[in-house]
Amino acid sequence: MNVQAHMSGQRSGQVPNQGTVPQNNGNSQMQNLVGSNGAATAVTGAGAATGSGTGVRPSRNIVGAMDHDIMKLRQYMQTLVFNMLQQRQPSPADAASKAKYMDVARRLEEGLFKMAVTKEDYMNRSTLESRITSLIKGRQINNYNQRHANSSSVGTMIPTPGLSQTAGNPNLMVTSSVDATIVGNTNITSTALNTGNPLIAGGMHGGNMSNGYQHSSRNFSLGSGGSMTSMGAQRSTAQMIPTPGFVNSVTNNNSGGFSAEPTIVPQSQQQQQRQHTGGQNSHMLSNHMAAGVRPDMQSKPSGAANSSVNGDVGANEKIVDSGSSYTNASKKLQQGNFSLLSFCPDDLISGQHIESTFHISGEGYSTTNPDPFDGAITSAGTGTKAHNINTASFQPVSRVNSSLSHQQQFQQPPNRFQQQPNQIQQQQQQFLNQRKLKQQTPQQHRLISNDGLGKTQVDSDMVTKVKCEPGMENKSQAPQSQASERFQLSQLQNQYQNSGEDCQADAQLLPVESQSDICTSLPQNSQQIQQMMHPQNIGSDSSNSFSNLAVGVKSESSPQGQWPSKSQENTLMSNAISSGKHIQEDFRQRITGMDEAQPNNLTEGSVIGQNHTSTISESHNLQNSIGTTCRYGNVSHDPKFKNQQRWLLFLRHARSCKPPGGRCQDQNCVTVQKLWSHMDNCADPQCLYPRCRHTKALIGHYKNCKDPRCPVCVPVKTYQQQANVRALARLKNESSAVGSVNRSVVSNDSLSANAGAVSGTPRCADTLDNLQPSLKRLKVEQSFQPVVPKTESCKSSIVSTTEADLSQDAERKDHRPLKSETMEVKVEIPDNSVQAGFGIKETKSEPFENVPKPKPVSEPGKHGLSGDSPKQENIKMKKEPGWPKKEPGCPKKEELVESPELTSKSRKPKIKGVSLTELFTPEQVREHIRGLRQWVGQSKAKAEKNQAMENSMSENSCQLCAVEKLTFEPPPIYCTPCGARIKRNAMYYTVGGGETRHYFCIPCYNESRGDTILAEGTSMPKAKLEKKKNDEEIEESWVQCDKCQAWQHQICALFNGRRNDGGQAEYTCPYCYVIDVEQNERKPLLQSAVLGAKDLPRTILSDHIEQRLFKRLKQERTERARVQGTSYDEIPTVESLVVRVVSSVDKKLEVKSRFLEIFREDNFPTEFPYKSKVVLLFQKIEGVEVCLFGMYVQEFGSECSNPNQRRVYLSYLDSVKYFRPDIKSANGEALRTFVYHEILIGYLEYCKLRGFTSCYIWACPPLKGEDYILYCHPEIQKTPKSDKLREWYLAMLRKAAKEGIVAETTNLYDHFFLQTGECRAKVTAARLPYFDGDYWPGAAEDIISQMSQEDDGRKGNKKGILKKPITKRALKASGQSDFSGNASKDLLLMHKLGETIHPMKEDFIMVHLQHSCTHCCTLMVTGNRWVCSQCKDFQLCDGCYEAEQKREDRERHPVNQKDKHNIFPVEIADIPTDTKDRDEILESEFFDTRQAFLSLCQGNHYQYDTLRRAKHSSMMVLYHLHNPTAPAFVTTCNVCHLDIESGLGWRCEVCPDYDVCNACYKKEGCINHPHKLTTHPSLADQNAQNKEARQLRVLQLRKMLDLLVHASQCRSPVCLYPNCRKVKGLFRHGLRCKVRASGGCVLCKKMWYLLQLHARACKESECDVPRCGDLKEHLRRLQQQSDSRRRAAVMEMMRQRAAEVAGTSG
């Protein structure tokens, strides 16, 4: 017998093309299947190999029967088609596109070859284009398989006696009808492997039969993409003659049928009808059912059967996923009639009627018979045991295109299909022994086959009637496959055959449990089975039931998704016989009621609440498919554990069952709901309420169980998780395709109405037998040790192939095969596995925590937003995410996922706003996700790279942004001693932790010669230092949805980890949220639920800036409309802007010591009080208020001494480039520039109105790699150079000058270092305004230090600012005469400082808000301003005017001129006498200093490099602003003296220190307190956020700081100040603690945090609070290092600029 190889669209790594494989079986005419004219019929791909055939026996010769001329001809045609496709493309194709075109060309050529009648037709180039067009439209290719429909019906033909049974006539051999263009994802079409007859001996089993009948070949066809396609008995129709009088069957070529013929047909049954509907495109059913049918079986005499196999795999049109990869959506359903001849082993036939059955090891199949005419919905799955699996174990994943149908199973050496007799006998004996052992089990599970017409249910344990025969098992080899006989339909036309359109249906692959459990199954009633399996088509009246055959149809489109079928155990089926009358009656009923067939609607709720078999899990099937290696042992099948599993699931069902009572089909549901209600309020550990005590114990165990091998908890958790994953995956896939057709589902209520209930048994009971521990893939951020059983090695190969959700149009026009992907997944069951049903939330990774995140193995092909599969760029909606749409009759969401009531009853804190998307409308959510995939802020190359990842999403990818791994920008590290930044990938040393961590660069480490190193005055042993490399990468954290169990990046989900309440907060992903909102199951939260920018306190300053900004924006919009000539309403405007002052605190600036030493005699102030303010601009972008702009200012008021009196310093200003709309204003500048300028002008106007006289701006861009305020800027935003930045400021000042806000603009050098014109002011450093963080104060310290070293005779610093020191002679030459003491130092300082500043003097901008006196240069605020009538720039104050009048005429204005100008007074009015701020103090620990905010952002990775991150970072910044964190001291219970957790205690409203824990409060007689006790506020209570609550928290923080100061000064042992003793106790703890904060001591960390808060706000130079001085010195050092780096960068920039100027001039 021979094997035909039909390959199409082969890809690398798949089964090679196989040529004809001859075998010496006594029939020489069968040695060659392909003749000279028909060789190509065996080759559908032009590149088919010729010498790689595989037969049953490896010793047979391999002969290539391919005609090379035909192959070359076909290759030439492929090239023509390929060139034609390329010419149609507008742009040159890349390598990937060429590969796609070549694949399309290959399939088009195949269609052309099949269509061609003659060689001339095939080669005709004039008609080539029209033929290709018709092929693309899908008519010829789609109907190619129907060419058999007009051929003679083989079902009504019998062999012609006397004719030689040869297949030598090529015209009678039909190539595989699985067409790649129809299948869409066909990787391998029908590769028929001739398995031959294992028993080649003569007689009954060998060679040709003596009666002249052909010994039927057994064809095993491998389906496309790894699926098994059509498989049946081959018989040359040339030897068949029509049988008169028989009704012709309607053949469904795309149905999943089964056809089996006996090897020896008794003469009495020669005329028996053998209808064949195992069409060539039977992707699953006929293949799997045909596989393994033993050739040595005799037909049963009985002519009537009750198990007609449905030609359309029992698929109801409403259930079939017409968008799936194997569905022809344009076709209607096709009925097919079958004649199934069941077999039983010949050595078991003893003349009496024996129930026929067969067992197939390796591949296990079983048939379920709900109805004699509905046909068998079959499911095929691996039944191999551990000893049947080689090292490359196959792992079934219960889905179409899963590992069972993957081609790798069949890429075995030829000897994999061969069995030695001794092995076969051993396996037979082992099988029987195991069957006997199983019979001893107390519970015999059987599957009852019911004909659906009220016939007697027949129990059958068919294993007792089976004797394992050759070919049954493959020990340590791949499953041996034997095919039933299949008819190769010829191309002859037959008037009796009716053609019908086909509808393909996916079949689900279900693994079968190991051999030891092969007999077990659960009882099921007929109504269940009918609901599980609703075949639409009608089988013939002559069919038998098959044992060990089960096929479940998988409907992707319906919400329930999976057909309930036994996925773990080999289900045994009885042979229920019915009469022809009943068959005909049911036939009529089915025809008339076809459209009323009830489709299965299995949801998560119905699985639990009804007596169904289990839904199919993704990965728990692996446990049985690979044997005991990854199983938890037989203990999981203990009835005790099974009952506990059932009870847990039924509890979960009752908890979420809706409505609460009365309508649930299970009578026990209401009872369990009452039990839940009782347990919610029951606190009695010995409660006598029925089931209460034991249920609470079981739930308690379930909550706390961490055992990865627990036989109760792990299966339940696995089932719950995977049910939710599949539910949401189906919902995502439903609407993700370009267009879905024929998607109609029936609600769960209709299913419940027809479902039978088992009285007294929870309906979830039947699901538990299938629950096995599943794979839980751990998502690793850094490194971790996987949690796996010590004695098990559970590494398996999960082979999954993706599904395409094609629309009708996509299926016709582009059928791109999908690559199968093999992933190595290590079985690791984490301790923190999901416990979704009873209030246990999986721990989510927080910042700073490198915790592995479990992420479920999602269903292949259901990744991401559009349910798109890998390698499907052609049908992917790249820009618009797909969304699950509510179909008519779609079950409610709470039936698929956990209801909010469940989570709240299970004590999950219902914290509102844990994700900001909860405030969004569905459209805003969609807009947000669209924005995620735009990658705004990244460079074009990176953005395109990330966008390309959408087309290859995997289960590792984020479901929102479609990218898998995203890492943060590493925060900069600075050396503690020298302040230098440690470069990326450089080595360094570190010690300590948290705020006390110190870093040492290699040079500083090497400079310290001893065994210790000095850091901030503390000596540290070098032995404790840890050497590291600055190459750490931190991955973005993930969060898991509590409903669908899907994972997203926290940033993508706008998830607030601070609200997570220890990982227990309920989180709903955007997908589930949108579904809930659109189904009216929830409403978006009010905007007030999460406080935003508008909820921040308003101040006079913020109102002033906002009002001015909005007014000017209206004017600008009007101007734009005028310029563009359009109406005002048509002009885009700026929306949703919010300006707020987030910090306004009093500070003191201490004068540096060396500078103060010079001017101490002049009574120079030792410190300058000022107010530090932070102004932020927010704009709502895609529903999120994003911080776009910020500035720090220092206000030195009228109470401050000179030279800082009434001055303002613009300390830092920063922005990010996300402003919307990104357009130009009327004057040509960017609209965002207009807005930022108006904010600055508004602030200057506000300062002028308050009485400030000047503003100082240092136009200094940030260093490369560093930031001022907002951490990590986008790549698209270039850092401006100093000249560009300076011009930006000057443009703003020119606008302000036009409005009269700015009186004069100059620079620091011209105003203070020169005496030009009539200026009479002294040039001294004492006149320079002294600002915190400015350039010159730090530079002055360096210069003074250098001068001191010169005076001491020491060598100056080589890196000094000046190469040549300035001598007194030089000063004398310049006109300076006073060289005494400090005056000399002052002059030298001004000279050196002037030389330093002069090259960049334009960057130090002095803005005069009031007029300055020409003589003394003071800014006038009172009295009169004396103005010259002729000189506009000359004006004097009252004091200088009086002095001017006393001078001689030649010294008066104008100096040295005879004509004197008239000077007249102008009264100075409207300037306040003081600059007192009427705004309240606003404290913010995070915005206290620029460095504090930057550290917050760096430590928590609040980056602004992309809009995606900027939205999340701004959300978190607003959270911190609204929730100032008051330190939480440990509260002690006054009764039991144990610590009270936050929010879990009671406090007296009168007594300050009386607190009681919950346990003591509930105990009777424990509390004897006269005052009222109130509960502690918890995180859940923070939902009701309001401004009063925020003010209260601010007040608490202030009280805490006051308490710290009080405790540090208090000496009373019995102080009555609340919590004073506790703070003192912390002080004492800090003295004796050896662990310290750096070692992780909780108390020390709290104390350290409190001390830092105090030190930042402390203004006392001599403070009694411990470590206050040290902390302030630490902060000063950090600021000094930052200023030094800034100055050094400026000097380097100036040096480069000077070099450039010198180069150009030279």
Curated annotation (Swiss-Prot):
<dbReference type="InterPro" id="IPR043145">
    <property type="entry name" value="Znf_ZZ_sf"/>
</dbReference>
<dbReference type="GO" id="GO:0006355">
    <property type="term" value="P:regulation of DNA-templated transcription"/>
</dbReference>
<feature type="compositionally biased region" description="Basic and acidic residues">
    <location>
        <begin position="870"/>
        <end position="896"/>
    </location>
</feature>
<dbReference type="GO" id="GO:0008270">
    <property type="term" value="F:zinc ion binding"/>
</dbReference>
<dbReference type="InterPro" id="IPR031162">
    <property type="entry name" value="CBP_P300_HAT"/>
</dbReference>
<feature type="binding site">
    <location>
        <position position="1569"/>
    </location>
    <ligand>
        <name>Zn(2+) 4</name>
    </ligand>
</feature>
<protein>
    <recommendedName>
        <fullName>Histone acetyltransferase HAC12</fullName>
        <ecNumber>2.3.1.48</ecNumber>
    </recommendedName>
</protein>
<feature type="binding site">
    <location>
        <position position="1571"/>
    </location>
    <ligand>
        <name>Zn(2+) 4</name>
    </ligand>
</feature>
<feature type="zinc finger region" description="TAZ-type 1">
    <location>
        <begin position="637"/>
        <end position="716"/>
    </location>
</feature>
<keyword id="KW-0863">Zinc-finger</keyword>
<dbReference type="InterPro" id="IPR035898">
    <property type="entry name" value="TAZ_dom_sf"/>
</dbReference>
<feature type="compositionally biased region" description="Polar residues">
    <location>
        <begin position="397"/>
        <end position="406"/>
    </location>
</feature>
<keyword id="KW-0862">Zinc</keyword>
<comment type="function">
    <text>Acetyltransferase enzyme. Acetylates histones, giving a specific tag for transcriptional activation.</text>
</comment>
<feature type="binding site">
    <location>
        <begin position="1213"/>
        <end position="1215"/>
    </location>
    <ligand>
        <name>acetyl-CoA</name>
    </ligand>
</feature>
<feature type="zinc finger region" description="ZZ-type 1">
    <location>
        <begin position="1408"/>
        <end position="1471"/>
    </location>
</feature>
<feature type="zinc finger region" description="PHD-type">
    <location>
        <begin position="998"/>
        <end position="1075"/>
    </location>
</feature>
<keyword id="KW-0805">Transcription regulation</keyword>
<feature type="zinc finger region" description="ZZ-type 2">
    <location>
        <begin position="1528"/>
        <end position="1581"/>
    </location>
</feature>
<feature type="zinc finger region" description="TAZ-type 2">
    <location>
        <begin position="1588"/>
        <end position="1671"/>
    </location>
</feature>
<feature type="binding site">
    <location>
        <position position="1536"/>
    </location>
    <ligand>
        <name>Zn(2+) 3</name>
    </ligand>
</feature>
<feature type="region of interest" description="Disordered">
    <location>
        <begin position="791"/>
        <end position="909"/>
    </location>
</feature>
<feature type="binding site">
    <location>
        <begin position="1232"/>
        <end position="1233"/>
    </location>
    <ligand>
        <name>acetyl-CoA</name>
    </ligand>
</feature>
<feature type="compositionally biased region" description="Low complexity">
    <location>
        <begin position="407"/>
        <end position="434"/>
    </location>
</feature>
<feature type="binding site">
    <location>
        <position position="1533"/>
    </location>
    <ligand>
        <name>Zn(2+) 3</name>
    </ligand>
</feature>
<dbReference type="Pfam" id="PF00569">
    <property type="entry name" value="ZZ"/>
</dbReference>
<dbReference type="GO" id="GO:0005634">
    <property type="term" value="C:nucleus"/>
</dbReference>
<feature type="region of interest" description="Disordered">
    <location>
        <begin position="397"/>
        <end position="456"/>
    </location>
</feature>
<feature type="region of interest" description="Disordered">
    <location>
        <begin position="1"/>
        <end position="33"/>
    </location>
</feature>
<dbReference type="InterPro" id="IPR013083">
    <property type="entry name" value="Znf_RING/FYVE/PHD"/>
</dbReference>
<dbReference type="Pfam" id="PF08214">
    <property type="entry name" value="HAT_KAT11"/>
</dbReference>
<feature type="binding site">
    <location>
        <position position="1437"/>
    </location>
    <ligand>
        <name>Zn(2+) 1</name>
    </ligand>
</feature>
<dbReference type="InterPro" id="IPR000197">
    <property type="entry name" value="Znf_TAZ"/>
</dbReference>
<keyword id="KW-0677">Repeat</keyword>
<feature type="binding site">
    <location>
        <position position="1431"/>
    </location>
    <ligand>
        <name>Zn(2+) 2</name>
    </ligand>
</feature>
<dbReference type="GO" id="GO:0004402">
    <property type="term" value="F:histone acetyltransferase activity"/>
</dbReference>
<dbReference type="InterPro" id="IPR000433">
    <property type="entry name" value="Znf_ZZ"/>
</dbReference>
<dbReference type="InterPro" id="IPR019786">
    <property type="entry name" value="Zinc_finger_PHD-type_CS"/>
</dbReference>
<feature type="binding site">
    <location>
        <position position="1560"/>
    </location>
    <ligand>
        <name>Zn(2+) 3</name>
    </ligand>
</feature>
<dbReference type="InterPro" id="IPR011011">
    <property type="entry name" value="Znf_FYVE_PHD"/>
</dbReference>
<keyword id="KW-0808">Transferase</keyword>
<feature type="binding site">
    <location>
        <position position="1428"/>
    </location>
    <ligand>
        <name>Zn(2+) 2</name>
    </ligand>
</feature>
